[in-house]
Amino acid sequence: MVLTLSYVAVDKTSIAYAEEAQKESEQMNKEEKADGAVSVSTPSAILMEASTGQVVYEKNCDERRPPASVTKVMTLLLIFDALKDEKIHLTDEVTVSEYAASMGGSQVFLEPGEVQTVDTLIKCISVASANDACVAMAEYVSGDENAFVEAMNQRAKNLGMKNTHFVNCNGLDTDGHETTARDIALMSRELITKYPKIYEYCNIWMEDITHTTKKGTTTFGLSNTNKLIRHYEYATGLKTGSTGKAKFCISATAKKEDVELIAVIMAAEDSKTRNKDAVTLLNYGFGKCQKYAEKTCKTEKAVPVRRGIEKQVKTKQKNPYIYVDTTGADLSGMKRRVRLKKELDAPVKKGEKAGTAEYYLGDKKIGSVDIVAVQDIREIDMKSVFEDLIQLILL
């Protein structure tokens, strides 16, 4: 027996939301142009530029609050870490445990013993915010949810998420399960910049999955909980959440031309306010931010090496320089000054600092990037001297 669930009700809601969102967006644009300022009604929020991590706007962003399903940003980050390390693969088949299937809240109604691929479960988490799929993946990656949550907290610590403590992998209300708008922005930035493949999942608007169990085969329709990806033209993701304690939260990502932003809203009174405030911040950011970004790492002059088997070492800029301006400055006037060390002492290690590239707007220094050695240079020793003498004699 095959059963297909209908999308009709969702479509009507989406149409109504689209019309309302368009009116709100037009009004917000008028308000922002009027005074250039921005404000949101929700108690905690942050706007971050993704490539640099620069904070463009903040409001009580270090207050600890329950994040609801925005927790799943970290769950997805650990899943993608495991994929990168080849501990798991998208085609792997995951057997759903009785515990995973028992999860309440938003779910895709997985049943004990049901088998789904990693790829499908990522869709269930990203699109439908499925709590049961989260636990199934946590158990598959780490053996059990507790071990997975320990890994979540360690990853948070490594990212500098100073005010975060996870108790579960899906964000269901639990005492002590808290984070902040700033910390959500940090983990969101890590996910989208390190694993842009996440966009392939969180931009799915609707898609069917198939349940195959002892009861038979049924088709279940996934519908994206993040309405912004359909109704805000620059939206790219990322994750919504709502519970009784957390109220309405979102980590909203968007990109316009070369500027990519992360807007985090926590504890909004309803989904309308949550989405409106997210769009307000994103529009504000796109109006304020302009970006200077180098595409390649420039090669610099060689630096002399004292007591090295090579007399000099080649150097290059460690990484391309990126700068985000919010003041309206003329970035075409950006100046670059290179300061190399007079010499390096052997042994020289690849990646060792050999100088600095400094960036100026007018007389103001706005940033710098290290210039590093591109190779190892060993210190000269008697063996090296003897080998050189032999070469000279043979010549």
Predicted regions span which residues?
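Sec-dependent N-terminal signal peptides of Gram-positive bacterial secreted proteins and lipoproteins
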Residues: 1-15
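Domain-terminus/edge residues, biased toward the C-terminal soluble/receptor-binding domains
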Residues: 161-162, 173-178, 182-395
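Active-site-adjacent loops and short helices of periplasmic peptidoglycan-processing enzymes
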Residues: 12-199
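A generic local structural motif
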Residues: 2-4, 31-33, 249
